[in-house]
């Protein structure tokens, strides 16, 4: 009798819970945009500012120092741009610090996430341009693979290449001509290439790098490409020189 009573009570409880449960169904979705702009600056939240202040002070002390000065606006775009030329040239420039003499350099334009405005360049500006934790990298490619690499660069409409590289590509992404320092690429020769580790792994459709040999990929904090850029800019600033670059026909899209 006692067991039957318990079973009856459990059954009643289950029915009660089932009858009280709600089954919701989504009937529609509405949304609106909340604009976050200078309107909020007129009524700052004191408590929020008090919370942020110590962190802001520390961040500003890292991001605000000036590391160089841009003589002109430097942006990144395909097939060739001032910023892409500058960063590729910096990769070649830093080779001496690693006992390297690169024949040329390649930097992916997709890794350049901002631009340098004319005037002072802060560490924070460099972080905006190069936000990823990429390291400087040196590899060797056979000439036949260099030609293949340049073909892959043509297929995406251009990447950052250093001074001395001259590519002519078609509007539909075919490599028409490739020269290095005015000479044709020797398919049998070895070429030393400066790049970043992400690109050296064959990413961004630059798969020719997967055939590279003799990789040197230092992994210290100072080997981050961002630090390499800062080092270059500080060296220029110490010499009283502004940072600048120019379009010089490294990658040309043929009219026909």
Language-model features: where?
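Feature captures C-terminal
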Residues: 22-37, 86, 92-94, 100-105, ...
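Bacterial N-terminal signal peptides that target proteins for export
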Residues: 1-9
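Hard-cation-handling environments
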Residues: 31-116
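Hydrophobic alpha-helical targeting segments used for export or membrane insertion
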Residues: 11-14
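C-terminal motif of bacterial Sec signal peptides marking the signal peptidase cleavage site
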Residues: 16-19
């Amino acid at each position: 009798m006692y067991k039957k009573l318990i079973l009856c009570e459990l059954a009643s409880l289950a029915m009660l819970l089932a009858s009280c449960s709600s089954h919701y169904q989504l009937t529609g979705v509405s949304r609106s945009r909340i604009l976050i702009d200078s309107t909020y600056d007129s009524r700052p939240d004191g408590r929020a500012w008090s919370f942020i202040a110590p962190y802001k002070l520390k961040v500003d002390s890292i991001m605000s120092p000036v590391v160089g000065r841009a003589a002109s606006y430097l942006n990144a775009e395909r097939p060739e741009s001032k910023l892409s030329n500058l960063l590729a040239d910096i990769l070649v420039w830093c080779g001496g610090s690693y006992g390297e003499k690169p024949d040329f350099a390649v930097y992916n334009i997709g890794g350049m996430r901002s631009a340098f405005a004319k005037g002072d360049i802060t560490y924070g500006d460099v972080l905006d341009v190069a936000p990823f934790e990429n390291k400087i990298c040196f590899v060797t490619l056979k000439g036949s693979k260099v030609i293949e690499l340049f073909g892959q660069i043509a297929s995406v409409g251009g990447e950052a290449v250093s001074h001395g590289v001259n590519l002519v590509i078609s509007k539909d992404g075919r490599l028409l001509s490739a020269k290095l320092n005015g000479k044709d690429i020797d398919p049998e020769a070895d070429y030393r290439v400066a790049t970043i580790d992400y690109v050296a792994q064959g990413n961004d459709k630059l798969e020719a790098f997967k055939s590279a040999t003799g990789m040197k990929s230092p992994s210290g904090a100072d080997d981050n490409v961002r630090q390499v850029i800062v080092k270059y800019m500080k060296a220029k600033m110490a010499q009283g020189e502004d940072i600048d670059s120019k379009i010089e026909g490294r990658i040309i899209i043929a009219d026909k």
